[in-house]
């Protein structure tokens, strides 16, 4: 997020719900649009809650002062996941990666991705008062490991002379695939006021 209003240390709670279908671009969504009432939330789908403060006290000052650091609310989707067809995956990232290997063409653009792999998420405030973040981007990061060949340098000495040789070695590598929100990604806000007050 790019900033906030209120108390950055106020405890808040949100839940991320998996959508059953994407929100279409050619439709107008007003602030009273409720994805739950309109049937957009997948029954039995992923629902992950997170308690947070806008100022993350777990981030050290060196990291926070780095010009590339962006304040964020991080929700891990690392629990076992079952897709609409009933297939079980070790976590949501495994689901996304296996969908890529099954049908790479579903990753060619945002439209194919949201209509065939990840229809989206609905983030609902579940509790807390006193702060509001100015959300500027939503992003899905898939962390994964794979085996790959890397070039390593090996230094030896022959007759007091250094000899540098390169060799290919099979290693386990860690990477991240990021799926950031773009202009095709709809970010809508549902506002409901306390009608009793």
Task: Name each model feature, range by range.
Residues 1-197:
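Secreted, disulfide-rich extracellular signaling modules
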